[in-house]
């Protein structure tokens, strides 16, 4: 993610979790010309043109365009981690794990599993943060087995985090991943707010 975007976010002191989530999700949906119809979670985060927040969305989107940001799911994951307050970061130990490191860890975990085992294996992250590891795992299972994301979320993923916003952001990221792959539905997530 471009450092200018981080500077923009700091300068505008975006601290309201709900607004930040709506802003990031709406910008992502707008950027990729997506429009969820059936996924109630994503629909809840879309900023409408008549909304008072629409001007902030346009300003944020202009920054993304100005600095040529791809605004991938990976960028969105990094942004979600960036806006965690320093006090929350200290309490929860939240830290962004880069994609390359996540991929290496996941590769180590699944090494030796055949396709049938991968279809039925359950992956847990008991301090899942914004769900970066689950993005990596879901993509890998989908690519190697063809399993629908809805089924992966229901059968293969179990996550816990102490912060409610982290679980919400994990759900949002996974829902966007599915939407980008043609799955626009409500999902049964095994993601829970708890102190592990």
Summary of predicted features, one role per range:
Residues 37-44, 49-50, 55-62, 66-67, ...:
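SAM-dependent methyltransferase catalytic region
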Residues 1-72:
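Non-catalytic nucleic-acid substrate-recognition regions in nucleic-acid-modifying enzymes
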